[in-house]
């Protein structure tokens, strides 16, 4: 099993058109401060909820800080049987640089 690396723009397109889920694997403090709009915070504690909510054929996109550790998580999810797994190139930093929608502690920041 493998995963595919995609741009933040492609990730946003997949979220909108393919109902893909974006998994943010950063620490809780950073996630609560700012995140990609609609992101699911994937942790050891929330993994069961993720498994219960999303089938193996659901498109799954993983994002971290810089696009490095998301590759390991994407590979793990593919090994677990998820068929459509992607990693965001540049991670959350890339998402911000692309000017894509975000949620912050202060509300939603639109495009």
UniProtKB/Swiss-Prot annotation:
Domain of life: Bacteria
Alphabetized InterPro entries for the sequence: GlpE_sulfurtransferase, Rhodanese-like_dom, Rhodanese-like_dom_sf, Thiosulf_sulfurTrfase
GO BP terms, alphabetized: glycerol metabolic process
EC numbers for this chain: 2.8.1.1
Sequence ranges assigned to domain Rhodanese in this UniProt record: 16-104
Stored CDD domains: GlpE_ST
Matching PROSITE patterns: RHODANESE_3 (PS50206)
Family per similarity comment: Belongs to the GlpE family.
Function as written in the Swiss-Prot or TrEMBL entry: Transferase that catalyzes the transfer of sulfur from thiosulfate to thiophilic acceptors such as cyanide or dithiols. May function in a CysM-independent thiosulfate assimilation pathway by catalyzing the conversion of thiosulfate to sulfite, which can then be used for L-cysteine biosynthesis.
Name recorded for this polypeptide: Thiosulfate sulfurtransferase GlpE
Source species taxonomy: Bacteria, Pseudomonadati, Pseudomonadota, Gammaproteobacteria, Pasteurellales
